[in-house]
A protein has these predicted regions:
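Nucleotide-activated sugar donor-binding and catalytic core shared by glycosyltransferases
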Residues: 2-9, 16-18, 22-409
Length: 409
């Protein structure tokens, strides 16, 4: 952090003093008034990771940029000045949002104050639509250009939000192939940039082949990246694991721990529910879990797509509060909720949602998949084929192209 302030303001003695000052105070002192200023907002773990890749791509081309905004560990590590930690405002479900309302309102005020203080040259929004569209409205009033990277799933539910996007967003950078046509039909400027997950090192066909040679099956548990998701999903997954252990005594279990989740919290849930089963916890390394598992139990979200491009079969599960589920169900316009199935255009992996996501049902589904090795291997190949629909590597570079064009206007 100190070295970054030295780069911004020139001397070590100045930098030591500046670390104690607010963003507004530093701006008023001219620390980065000669730099292009970019505000980036990512309210979820996946957005934080993708945002960090974008920031790195932009920094590689131009060191004379100043970034600040809302995010998590990944964005912070790139040098983004984090005004608010994303965990303070991240939430899943409709009724679940009420507990975060004070934090959300405080964060909106902070963003508005930041806009007035330093007048950014560009606002980059990453998914997280209910919060980000409020921010976009403020930016629009102030004449700040808005780039929206990773579209809200308005093609799936609450399609009326497209009218807001049309009014508030200057350019959409979308990561799913069918989203480009959706926005073009609405005459909204859009570019399909491909999926940023393809920028990660991908397992080779040989590595996937080796996984099937292991006689001892390992099952991955991917309960989500938010506190509420883990509270709802992990106990059910652990109970399902205990049922599976009674049927397959040699089975192993690995829990994927998101970088933004405290390990002690997960360990406490495991302690309460594990019974005779043993669980390895893989902190911050979902790739290790995917590459080591023949099947994963995965909370619906980005990680299901990551499972697909690694060729790992999965059971998608999801639970929210009963009220959130009823309200959400009334607004959903698609048959499947899993990204894997949406991109495939059919259900290629099972989805167990709400009441269907019981420990018994999950265990039965996983056991059935493990009992058909040839079918499981064929499913792995189907999942790998989805890579071809995701645009190839280079998403961050393509979004950076758009960002720099907008900065130059």
């Amino acid at each position: 952090m100190l070295s970054r302030y030295i780069r911004l303001c020139g001397t070590a003695s100045d930098a030591v003093k500046l670390e104690t000052l607010s963003l507004g105070e530093r701006y008023s002192m001219g620390c980065f008034s000669n730099k292009k200023r970019v505000v980036i907002i990512a309210g979820e773990t996946s957005g934080d990771l993708h945002g960090a890749k974008l920031v790195k791509a932009m920094q590689k081309r131009n060191k004379g940029l100043f970034f600040c905004g809302i995010g998590g560990q990944a964005l912070r590590e790139t040098g983004v000045d984090i005004l608010i930690d994303a965990r303070e405002i991240s939430v899943v479900g409709i009724t679940e949002v009420f507990s975060k309302v004070p934090n959300i309102l405080r964060s909106l005020r902070m963003v508005k104050k930041t806009f007035k203080t330093m007048r950014p040259d560009l606002l980059i929004l990453i998914d997280f639509p209910d919060f980000n569209l409020h921010v976009a409205a403020t930016a629009k009033k102030m004449g700040i250009p808005v780039l929206y990277y990773i579209s809200p799933q308005i093609w799936a539910w609450r399609p009326g939000r497209v009218k807001k996007i049309e009014k508030l967003v200057d350019h959409m950078a979308v990561i799913l192939p069918f989203e480009e046509d959706f926005y073009r039909k609405q005459k909204i400027p859009v570019t399909f940039v491909g999926h940023p997950l393809l920028e990660n090192s991908l397992p080779t066909a040989q590595r996937i082949e080796d996984k099937w040679k292991d006689d001892v099956p390992a099952i991955g548990l991917l309960p989500g990246s938010r506190h509420g998701e883990i509270e709802r999903h992990l106990p059910i997954m652990i109970d399902a694991a205990r049922i599976l252990l009674k049927r397959i005594q040699t089975i192993k279990f690995i829990i994927s721990l998101s970088p933004d989740v405290e390990e002690k919290h997960v360990k406490e849930i495991v302690r309460k529910h594990k019974g005779e089963a043993d669980f390895e916890i893989a902190a911050g390394n979902v790739r290790k879990v995917l590459e080591g598992s023949k099947v994963v139990m995965a909370a619906s979200g980005t990680v299901t797509l990551e499972s697909a491009i690694s060729g790992t079969p999965m059971v998608i599960i999801y639970k929210v509060s009963p009220v959130s589920f009823r309200l959400g169900k009334a607004m959903i316009r698609v048959k499947n909720i899993g990204l894997v199935n949406l991109i495939a255009g059919k259900e290629i992996v099972p989805e167990l949602i709400q009441e269907e996501a019981s420990s018994t049902r999950i265990a039965d589904t996983v056991f059935k998949m493990l009992s058909d090795p040839s079918g499981l291997k064929q499913l792995s190949l189907e999942l790998l084929a989805l890579r071809d629909k995701l645009g190839g590597p280079g998403a961050s570079e393509r979004v950076a192209d758009i960002a720099f064009r907008m900065l130059e206007k």
